[in-house]
């Protein structure tokens, strides 16, 4: 709607800022320093509105503190590391039409550039420049001298230095472990290697070996091994492919999908395929009870989960019960767990209520949880097992809680050599960026960062208490993640990035090289290109001979050391909520390892997600909303507000035109209003009530805005700045025929400066109508720039309350008033009661206690009235008398004009001679007159 208007102004001032080097920051001991950072972005795509939310949230705070007199450093860098860039380049090289069309239509990459992006380094460089331009376009106040990429040779040496330190400390280890793995690319994966940025979560499943007929065996995965006693059949999927594999000298039947997955975990050999028609001709033997089990096929078995073979316990699983009924054969049900909450055969009870698969899943999960936490193993189990097992079963399983019985059942299965475990991706399916499904794989001699090291983990948990986390609820979430931290693989066999110095076949993965890079912001712009690790020992740890190193590198290392010591630690780290799962804990861990608690970030600010069309942004949903597109459509400053100030910090927001357009309209109205008011030229010198009132109101708003910004309540701050001040100015011009030029000019100066962190371009344009300086470097307004006039606030608030009450009465009677009758109550008795109520409110005496100490019937109503007043007004009323009638008379013309009535009559409610219209006299209270409309 106004995008051209906003953008022309924005690009004009961005050029001026860059020309004047406004945001280039150097050491300055005369000011308090503030070092603020955001995560550097992957350069495999343009910036989207999700990036924008985090980055602009940080920029607003950086701009605010700069105007508060801080020496603010806000740097930026770019991450080329990892598989995202490589995966996209590979897709383009393969000619994948959907990727290429997405690049052209959504990312707006020119056709003649597509071919060039087959080279991953050129792709990364292309999007680096695009991102840098977008960051500038959105108004980020960055010191661009300090930028770098993760392919910078200085960054490579830095990572070698960092990993060397971790290795010396014993935090880098090699061992065998199970990790999420891409079969196609041949390396372990983490969150940033997967489509949708999903961290693979690996869980263990129990496996029980069943002997079968014709020399076949069945490998059965289960989450409920204790129900082996009640198994009446085995189940396979009715139309999936199955295979026979050789494992530990025996032939086992599993699904083909399971084999493809388990071959990365187990030493299995494919023997042959087998049809489900042949499988159901076989039978199996329950290894605990000796019962002969039929093999049945149905649609309820997931061939991709576990082994694709399921043991059927219909008494306790509604899907199993339903599957058995669909065979149209008689079957036995053996309940082996009992609870007070569930029926004896909960699987049957669920099916009798519904056969809807979604509803049955809820029943299944409820049964599982109830039996696990509240269930006991039934005595009947003892009669189901052979004699040689009876003693163990009696002592360790019968009558035991399910939680204990499960452990003991597993021990029994192990002793019979029929137990095994497999690994599953519990939050799968998850796909690598190359398109392959991620599988669990046991990796031999893999390098890991030992985030599960007990001493290191304990230090990290302790450190969290010394870091301010905003909003506070994220602290518990972070503590839980650190508590559950496990080893993380450090290397990848392919991708872009730094090679492990002791194993050049491995490339350091993207989460492992993004934990300490904020150190580099302090010095990289003054560092020579050709350096060795020893330079970092001196700059960051103070180790080494400065003069010898200076001769070697030709650089003033003492100055670099001083700059590091000046800026570090990071005062405020901004990030999106997704990175609390990995980057933030890793960031804390690595700082602790090398520096102890000395250089931990002082504060971490975490914001929620941005959704488009009500859903998370995803290439598959084709709802990626690039930041450059948003700027073109709506304009820079409206987008800044929309992304940061329309929801609470941790709350997700849905970005769309209905969100941004009203903001753009209001900003344009504000611009036009200020532009018009700046041209006002009047001779009014006296300070009238209306002038005192608007000064007091704006003073109060500025105090609230300052508090809101420092507590990251941007939405509240913006509501005050965009709407409250605007409405107050409108009310002011209703109150006065001729404005006070000096007062208005002062308020406009304050308003423009207050807006500057949020909408810096509009603010800069307006500011230059009254000054030649940059508003970005001006002083942020303080409340004490304006005086407080409680009597003026009280007077105008009183008048506005009358107007509000009249409007409400008109709505009730559905009629426009022609005459207004106002009853006021100013008796000495009521005034004294009001002062007593004010004292009670100020002393935080509860209403019940206050009314208990007085017999006055209106005490409660008076208490409620004064409790709604600001403290400054309450304090004023304690020491000053007000004349309500005089206030109304003084503002009579304004009231008549605003209400559009022909007559306003004022009555003293204590005067027995005045009429009691509609019985309203008795309802008049101090500061709360009774009103009648006719």
Curated annotation (Swiss-Prot):
Protein name listed in UniProt: Leucine--tRNA ligase 1
GO cellular component: cytoplasm
UniProt EC number: 6.1.1.4
GO MF terms held by the record: aminoacyl-tRNA deacylase activity; ATP binding; leucine-tRNA ligase activity
PANTHER family: LEUCINE--TRNA LIGASE, CYTOPLASMIC (PTHR45794:SF1), LEUCYL-TRNA SYNTHETASE (PTHR45794)
UniProt motif ('HIGH' region) ranges: 41-51
Membership in a protein family: Belongs to the class-I aminoacyl-tRNA synthetase family.
Segments carrying motif 'KMSKS' region: 616-620
Matching Gene3D superfamilies: Class I aminoacyl-tRNA synthetases (RS), HUPs, Isoleucyl-tRNA Synthetase, Domain 1, leucyl-tRNA synthetase, Valyl/Leucyl/Isoleucyl-tRNA synthetase, editing domain
Organism: Saccharolobus solfataricus (strain ATCC 35092 / DSM 1617 / JCM 11322 / P2) (Sulfolobus solfataricus)
Compartments in which it is found: Cytoplasm
């Amino acid at each position: 709607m106004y995008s051209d208007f906003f953008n022309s102004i924005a690009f004009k001032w961005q050029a001026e800022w860059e020309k004047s080097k406004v945001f280039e920051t150097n050491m300055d001991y005369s000011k308090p320093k503030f070092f603020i950072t955001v995560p550097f972005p992957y350069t495999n795509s343009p910036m989207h509105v999700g990036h924008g939310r985090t980055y602009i949230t940080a920029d607003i705070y950086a701009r605010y503190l700069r105007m508060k007199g801080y020496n603010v450093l806000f740097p930026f860098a770019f991450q080329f590391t990892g598989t995202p860039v490589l995966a996209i380049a590979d897709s383009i090289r393969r000619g994948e039409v959907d990727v290429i069309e997405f690049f052209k239509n959504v990312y707006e990459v020119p056709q003649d550039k597509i071919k060039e992006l087959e080279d991953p380094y050129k792709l990364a460089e292309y999007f680096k420049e695009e991102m840098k331009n977008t960051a500038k376009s959105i108004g980020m106040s960055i010191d661009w001298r300090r930028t770098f990429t993760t392919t910078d040779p200085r960054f490579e040496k830095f990572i070698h230095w960092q990993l060397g330190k971790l290795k010396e400390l014993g935090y880098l280890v090699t061992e065998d472990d199970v990790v999420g793995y891409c079969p196609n690319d041949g390396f372990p994966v983490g969150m940033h290697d997967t489509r949708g940025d999903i961290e693979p979560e690996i869980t263990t499943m129990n496996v029980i070996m069943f002997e079968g007929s014709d020399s076949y065996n069945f490998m059965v995965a289960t989450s409920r091994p204790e129900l082996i006693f009640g198994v009446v059949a085995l189940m396979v999927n009715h139309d999936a492919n199955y295979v026979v594999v050789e494992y530990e000298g025996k032939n086992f039947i599993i699904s083909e999908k399971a084999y493809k997955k388990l071959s990365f975990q187990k030493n299995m050999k494919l023997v042959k395929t087998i049809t489900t028609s042949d499988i159901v001709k076989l039978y199996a033997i329950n290894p605990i009870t000796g019962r002969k089990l039929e093999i049945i096929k149905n649609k309820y078995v997931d061939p991709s989960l576990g082994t694709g073979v399921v043991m059927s316990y219909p008494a306790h699983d509604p899907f199993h019960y339903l599957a058995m009924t669909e065979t149209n054969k008689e079957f036995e049900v053996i309940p082996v767990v009992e609870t007070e909450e569930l029926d004896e055969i909960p699987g049957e009870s669920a099916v009798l209520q519904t056969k809807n698969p979604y509803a049955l899943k809820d029943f299944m999960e409820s049964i599982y949880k109830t039996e696990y936490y509240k269930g006991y193993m039934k005595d009947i189990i003892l009669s189901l097992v052979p004699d040689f097992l009876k003693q163990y079963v009696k002592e360790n399983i019968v009558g035991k809680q399910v939680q204990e019985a499960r452990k003991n059942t597993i021990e029994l299965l192990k002793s019979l050599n029929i137990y095994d475990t497999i690994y599953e991706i519990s939050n799968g399916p998850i796909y690598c960026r190359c398109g392959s499904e991620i599988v669990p794989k046991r990796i031999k001699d893999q390098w890991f960062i030992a985030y599960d090291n007990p001493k290191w983990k304990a230090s990290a948990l302790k450190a969290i208490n010394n870091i301010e986390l905003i909003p506070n609820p994220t602290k518990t979430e972070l503590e839980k993640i650190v508590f559950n931290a496990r080893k993380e693989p450090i290397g990848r066999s392919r991708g872009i990035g730094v090679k492990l110095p002791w194993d050049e076949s491995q490339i350091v993965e993207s989460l492992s090289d993004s934990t300490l890079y904020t150190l580099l912001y302090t010095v990289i712009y003054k560092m020579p290109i050709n350096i060795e690790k020893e330079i970092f020992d001196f700059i960051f740890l103070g180790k080494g001979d400065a003069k010898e190193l200076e001769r070697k590198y030709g650089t003033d290392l003492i100055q670099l050391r001083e700059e590091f010591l000046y800026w570090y630690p990071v005062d405020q780290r901004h990030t999106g909520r997704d990175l609390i799962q990995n980057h933030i804990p890793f960031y804390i861990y690595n700082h602790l390892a090398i520096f102890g608690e000395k250089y931990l970030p002082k504060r971490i600010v975490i914001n929620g997600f941005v959704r488009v069309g009500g859903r998370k942004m995803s290439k598959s949903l084709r709802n990626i909303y690039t930041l450059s597109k948003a700027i073109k459509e709506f304009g820079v400053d409206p987008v800044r507000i929309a992304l940061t100030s329309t929801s609470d910090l941790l709350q997700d927001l849905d970005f769309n035109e209905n969100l941004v357009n009203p903001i753009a309209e209001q900003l344009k109205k504000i611009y036009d209003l200020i532009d018009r008011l700046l041209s006002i030229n009047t001779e009014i010198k006296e300070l009238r009530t209306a002038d005192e009132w608007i000064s007091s109101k704006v003073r109060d708003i500025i105090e609230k805005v300052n508090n809101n910004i420092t507590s990251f309540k941007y939405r509240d701050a913006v509501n005050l700045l965009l709407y409250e001040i605007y409405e107050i100015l409108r009310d002011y011009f209703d109150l006065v025929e001729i404005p006070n030029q000096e007062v208005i000019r002062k308020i406009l100066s304050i308003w423009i400066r207050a807006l500057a962190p949020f909408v810096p371009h509009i603010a800069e344009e307006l500011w230059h109508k009254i000054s030649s300086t940059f508003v970005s470097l001006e002083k942020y307004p303080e409340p004490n720039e304006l005086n407080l006039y409680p009597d003026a606030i009280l007077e105008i608030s009183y008048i506005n309350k009358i107007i509000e009450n009249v409007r409400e009465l008109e709505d009730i009677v559905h009629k426009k008033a022609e005459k207004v009758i106002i009853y006021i109550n100013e008796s000495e008795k009521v005034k004294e009661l009001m002062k007593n109520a004010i004292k009670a409110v100020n002393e935080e005496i509860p209403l019940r206690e206050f009314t208990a100490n007085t017999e006055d019937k209106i005490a409660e109503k008076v208490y409620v009235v004064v409790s709604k007043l600001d403290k400054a007004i309450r304090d004023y009323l304690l020491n000053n008398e007000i004349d309500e009638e005089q206030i109304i008379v003084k503002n009579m013309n304004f009231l008549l004009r605003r209400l559009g009535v022909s007559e306003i009559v004022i009555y003293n409610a204590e005067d027995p001679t005045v009429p009691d219209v509609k019985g309203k006299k008795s309802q008049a209270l101090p500061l709360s007159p009774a009103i009648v409309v006719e």
